[in-house]
């Protein structure tokens, strides 16, 4: 009988709190109990199973995100539900745009990578002119095919959509020789842009699977058959803005190629305080690992 009465009191308090939306103080005033007693009663009701809290995790993967954060020592992971939209590139790009809008700080410089998913971010980003942002390319890419996916073009498009500014790196992403790269890197304008990108507060980039037929790198036309063969021979599975390639063990490979890339270096990218990497597609699994 005592237990039935206790349950009745606890249930009544819960009904007032959860269904009538009364505050703990209002319930205390109404019942003549102290606010502390109301707080303890609500907790006891949870412990007894009178109240069950159900969180709708549909489309969310918080536990998996937490595991990934712990395993790879990441600040934050966002997994986009593939069942939400048939066009996953747009879904990932819109999520990246929202993340930028929510996290960038005023007067920041954002280093920008290249790729097909990256090229769509500007389609979803909102005006941020009050933030006075600067978008700066991580790597060159001017004057080649698939212009819309190059870092300079993406930087420019992001600047236009946000009402902010961008820099242009008017050079190829990859040149034919290390000597040609050194000559370009000695150009005053190119040097200034690269130095500005090195000082970026954020980096927004994607990962590529260099050996996939329709990868951004293969579409760009920068690599010869010999270059593609080198990627295969050295087991490259991950393309980081074409300034670094990794094998399945996570080790740097294909230095002969990255020694010819015109942009910041892999160590420069590491030194940028906050890096935001967006990845989409099953073919990127090995690149992400």
Short names for language-model regions:
Residues 2-14, 19, 23-27, 40-43, ...:
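Conserved phosphate- and dinucleotide-binding cores of soluble alpha/beta proteins
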Residues 14, 22, 31, 55-178, ...:
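N-terminal active-site beta-alpha-beta segment that forms phosphate/nucleotide-binding
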């Amino acid at each position: 009988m005592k237990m039935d009465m206790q349950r009745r009191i606890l249930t009544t308090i819960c009904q007032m709190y959860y269904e009538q939306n009364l505050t703990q103080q209002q319930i205390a005033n109404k019942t003549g109990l102290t606010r502390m007693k109301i707080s303890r009663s609500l907790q006891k009701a949870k412990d007894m199973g009178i109240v069950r809290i159900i969180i709708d995790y549909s489309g969310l993967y918080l536990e998996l995100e937490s595991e990934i954060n712990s395993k790879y020592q990441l600040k934050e992971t966002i997994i986009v539900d593939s069942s939400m939209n048939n066009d996953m590139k747009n879904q990932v790009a819109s999520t990246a745009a929202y993340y930028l809008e929510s996290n960038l700080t005023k007067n920041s410089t954002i280093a920008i990578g290249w790729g097909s998913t990256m090229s769509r971010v500007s389609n979803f980003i909102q005006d941020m002119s009050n933030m006075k942002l600067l978008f700066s390319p991580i790597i060159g890419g001017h004057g080649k095919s698939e212009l819309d996916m190059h870092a300079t073009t993406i930087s420019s498009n992001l600047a236009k959509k946000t009402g902010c500014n961008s820099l242009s790196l008017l050079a190829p992403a990859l040149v034919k020789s290390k000597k040609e790269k050194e000559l370009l890197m000695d150009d005053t304008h190119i040097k200034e842009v690269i130095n500005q990108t090195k000082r970026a507060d954020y980096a927004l980039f994607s990962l590529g699977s260099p050996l996939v037929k329709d990868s951004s790198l293969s579409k760009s036309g920068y690599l010869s058959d010999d270059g593609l063969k080198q990627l295969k021979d050295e087991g490259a599975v991950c393309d980081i803005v074409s300034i670094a390639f990794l094998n399945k063990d996570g080790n740097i490979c294909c230095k002969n190629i990255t020694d010819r890339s015109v942009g910041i270096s892999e160590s420069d990218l590491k030194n940028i305080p906050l890096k935001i990497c967006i990845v989409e597609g099953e073919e990127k699994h090995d690149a992400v690992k």
